[in-house]
């Protein structure tokens, strides 16, 4: 009987591990789905408020400055949500926004002697 009890205990542990693993997978899939839905919502808003050229500029800039682009996108989405953007933002307008945001940036330079 000891042997059967040990086998039952091993089976119970394995079943609990399997159930935990399945719950974790379901949670991860749910999180991925929610993130994808949020990104789709953001892109829809950006399509409404940015010209195609401005969207293209942001997508190129995202390759080198993802933090800046995320900040700009968040601000634009927030302004659109408050109704403060009344027209489509052109590429030139986006350039001026980006210039204003980056001109305050301080660069640290290290000189080797």
UniProtKB/Swiss-Prot annotation:
GO terms for molecular function: DNA binding. Pfam families: dsDNA_bind (PF01984). The keyword DNA-binding applies. Keywords: DNA-binding. Disulfide bonds: none annotated. One of its GO terms (cellular component) is cytosol. It comes from the Archaea. Belongs to the PDCD5 family. NCBIfam families: PRK04239.1 (NF003268). This is DNA-binding protein PTO0204.
